Structures are given as structure tokens and as C-alpha cells.
């Protein structure tokens, strides 16, 4: 029985390895959730970053809680998301574990710089949202960013998926 379980486990691990692919190198950052390594296009799995043309709003001056008047301004949250990812990677090699491909033939992957999960880091710092439609992996990280008013959670924004539908 033990031998049977060991064989089953080995076969299971082998099949899992067939579904994943490791991609590593110094990436070109396309936007907050897409990178290219060599000729491979990689979508950071489970997250959705603001689009490059997307604007978000944040309060930059609050008169007082009594008067209740805030000055808000639009900012390019998609560009900031991309820039923060560029700064985090800092021309270093990253390692991506791909689980499959999307409808655009991009690899869907979790990417790491050293031991830092970049997908998680983007969501936890308010630079992307958890892509709930495809994964529940980063919901706690999104809640953390929202609770602490980090990144896009400092103000108001449309979730990138909704913004794409409207634009």
C-alpha cells in the first residue's frame, strides 16, 4: 500500500511539472501586470493592474473634516504601477513559474525576484488588484492594501477590468 501511494505521488508530481514551465531572465516591463522575458510574453497571474491610459483620483488637500471639502486630482495610476514594478525589479533577473496560457497566448505566471512574489507584492502595495474572476490567491493582500490606503486605495478608481469595458 505504501509503495502504491509513493508511486501515485511521483506520478502526480510528474504531471504537475508538465503543466508548469519555468521562465527566467531580465524582463522588459510592459505594464503593471505584463512582462516580457526574451521572446516570451508573461501575464502576472491572479492580479490586474491599472491600464497604461487609466486615471485614478486621489485627495491631495483636505480643508477640514468640519467643512468636508477635499481637493482631488487625477493621476496616471497605470504608469505609476508600471514604474513601481520597474523600480522593484531594478534590472535584476526574475524567475516566473507559468501555470498555463491565456486567450492571448501569454504565459500565466507567478514571478519572483529573489524570494519575493512580485504578483503578491503588487497587490499588497496597492499597485494592482486581485483578479477575482480568475483567482482568489491575493484577496487578503488586496484587503491589506485597502485597509492601509496604499497605492490606488488612497483615492478612488475603477477596477481595471471595468475600466477596459468602458474604454
Give, region by region, the residue ranges found by the protein language model.
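Small beta-barrel nucleic-acid-binding modules, primarily SNase/OB-fold domains
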Residues: 2-8, 12-167
Amino acid at each position: 500500500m505504501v509503495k502504491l501511494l509513493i508511486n501515485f505521488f511521483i506520478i502526480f508530481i510528474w504531471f504537475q511539472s508538465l503543466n508548469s514551465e519555468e521562465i527566467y531572465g531580465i524582463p522588459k516591463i510592459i505594464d503593471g501586470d505584463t512582462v516580457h522575458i526574451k521572446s516570451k510574453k508573461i501575464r502576472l497571474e491572479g492580479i490586474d493592474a491599472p491600464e497604461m491610459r487609466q486615471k485614478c483620483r486621489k485627495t491631495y488637500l483636505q480643508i477640514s473634516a468640519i467643512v468636508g471639502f477635499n481637493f482631488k486630482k487625477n493621476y496616471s495610476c497605470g504608469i505609476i504601477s508600471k514604474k513601481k514594478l520597474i523600480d522593484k525589479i531594478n534590472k535584476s533577473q526574475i524567475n516566473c513559474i507559468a501555470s498555463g496560457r491565456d486567450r492571448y497566448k501569454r504565459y500565466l505566471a507567478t514571478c519572483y525576484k529573489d524570494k519575493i512574489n512580485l504578483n503578491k507584492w503588487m497587490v499588497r502595495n496597492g499597485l494592482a488588484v486581485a483578479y477575482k474572476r480568475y483567482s482568489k490567491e491575493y484577496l487578503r493582500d488586496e484587503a491589506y492594501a485597502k485597509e492601509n490606503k496604499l497605492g490606488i486605495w488612497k483615492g478612488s478608481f475603477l477596477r481595471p477590468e471595468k475600466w477596459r469595458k468602458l474604454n
